[in-house]
Amino acid sequence: MEKSGRESDGAPCGPVLHIVVVGFHHKKGCQVEFSYPPLIPGDGHDSHTLPEEWKYLPFLALPDGAHNYQEDTVFFHLPPRNGNGATVYGISCYRQIEAKALKVRQADITRETVQKSVCVLSKLPLYGLLQAKLQLITHAYFEEKDFSQISILKELYEHMNSSLGGASLEGSQVYLGLSPRDLVLHFRHKVLILFKLILLEKKVLFYISPVNRLVGALMTVLSLFPGMIEHGLSDCSQYRPRKSMSEDAGPQESNPSADDFTSESTSDVLNTSLETVTRVMAVNHGEDAVPKTEKPYFQVEGNNNKGQEPSDSGRYLELPPRPSPESSESDWETLDPSVLEDASLKEREQMGSDQTHLFQKDSLPSDSPPITVQPQANNRQVVLIPGLISGLEEDQYGMPLAIFTKGYLCLPYMALQQHHLLSDVTVRGFVAGATNILFRQQKHLSDAIVEVEEALIQIHDPELRKLLNPTTADLRFADYLVRHVTENRDDVFLDGTGWEGGDEWIRAQFAVYIHALLAATLQLDNEKMLSDYGTTFVAAWKNTHNYRVWNSNKHPALSEINPNHPFQGQYSVSDMKLRFSHSVQNSERGKKIGSVMVTTSRNVVQTGKAVGQSVGGAFSSAKTAMSSWLSTFTTSTPQSLPEPPNGKP
């Protein structure tokens, strides 16, 4: 059975890399108790040893405050091993059981309850699908009441790899468990603010407990970006660490010098046409290609670095040795145009003006994208690539955008032990989730805090708040989403699977929005078009890494897209109502006014009822008294005039 899930070289042949059990030890804390296959080749299944890159795995699988919940689910991301490959997607289901209920109680179980977590480490971002399977197995594993029975976990590994071996990242199974309908119902028009906030590559922290609500909200927001879940997170847990602590005091980003790049000779490039972009030319980049003082974000390392680890390894999310072709490719593909311009300027000083046209945009045809030189680490070769490519699998529109690249992290759940990442100078930004209140209290480490429970977005910088203030067209778009979702919220037959107002429909609306926005940026005389999206917002977005990468390439399919805002139009009375509603719900003054209005309305209603009851009661009493008096008068009159004797008056 073991052979069916592994290739001849011992590497997993399916999407699942490992099944891991994490437990809580009363002295050692969270630790790995079982892994299949072993996390480190050659170790036993019960080894506690962890790869350096995955040292936070136990704290991610068994999160803070796990003892407060009977069971929960966690999504988390791990960096690739040895810097090779892509993000490892982790799904964890944890439960707790009373120790007295166990059939076999081990000697190290000293507490009244036992907490354990079963994890799947996968190469595919099938969060909801893996969660559904894992919850069933975790329940069965705990029902055994004997945690030494590990056969069910091995069967889970084999079953998942056999059933998901040909799994595709296209289709609804990728979005299983991620509901934009619930997100829109909860955040309403603020969903668009979250969308734009991530487009600007800001530091965004989601906060709520328990963890399943946290990761669900965060990943659902990301699912609104076309292709992001399927292909946009492969580089979301990687970044280049500094080699020494002293460098942390430097600027957050510095452009690598020309010496950090590998360049071709002028004669070779002159003989290469722009159309032959895949031609491979040998180049030797030895020790002189390695910087001596600082390791920049993107660096071509020589063979002498093989197996070398940074001295301060304890504070890094990833400890890459000499990069593989994949990691080297990822580094070079995410360079922004300014890096190339800086490189060309330094080459001009060193090589002379006759050898600088390799990286000068002016020397290229006006309709040709800039050229980058992409090194290949293993075979010491470079490939000429037209434009800047993201390293992600893109569609005809350039989706997904290269947001989670070049040190911009996506961490659905962050353990307290990873707190240093928020202030690490080599991390450009992040979209991260936390349940520990310490993260929320450190407001200076983030640009925005999203409190999921209250559907509140706290943006610390007033200028950023102005930047994200929705335009009239944006408010119409958000209102359109909210109305269609709320109209169908009670439809038992919809359940998020229908079209209009359903999950897929909402994602389609955001796809239309981002396609139109991208198309608008390519138009001439587009000031009016861009004003519907927010002129200052678009200006800020054009300076982000993801837009520069996208804009450096041509996307002919966008010529068929209408660049106008989907909800452009003349200002009307209904727009005034939308603007007032938005202001009341978001500004502090508006919230106070709204609270006063609600309180006043309630008091008026209650007073009206009281007055009505008093007036009505008095009128009713008067009416009753009058009727009683008349009735007494009519009945007492014959008695006061007795009939005379003998029948005569």
UniProtKB/Swiss-Prot annotation:
Q: Recite the UniProt keywords alphabetically.
A: Endosome, Membrane, Methylation, Phosphoprotein, Transmembrane, Transmembrane helix
Q: Which residues form the cDENN domain?
A: 173-341
Which compartment or compartments is the protein found in?
Answer: Recycling endosome; Membrane
Tell me where in this chain the uDENN domain is found.
17-161
Which residue ranges does the record annotate as region Disordered?
Answer: 239-267, 283-336, 348-377
What segments bear the compositional bias annotation Basic and acidic residues? Answer: 285-295
- dDENN domain residues are 343-594
Sorted alphabetically, which InterPro entries does this protein's record hold?
ABL9/DENND6_dom (IPR018307), DENND11/AVL9_GEFs (IPR051731), Tripartite_DENN (IPR037516)
Give the family, as the similarity comment puts it: Belongs to the AVL9 family.
Function summary: Functions in cell migration.
The name under which this protein is listed is Late secretory pathway protein AVL9 homolog
Q: Give the species.
A: Mus musculus
Q: Gene behind this chain?
A: Avl9
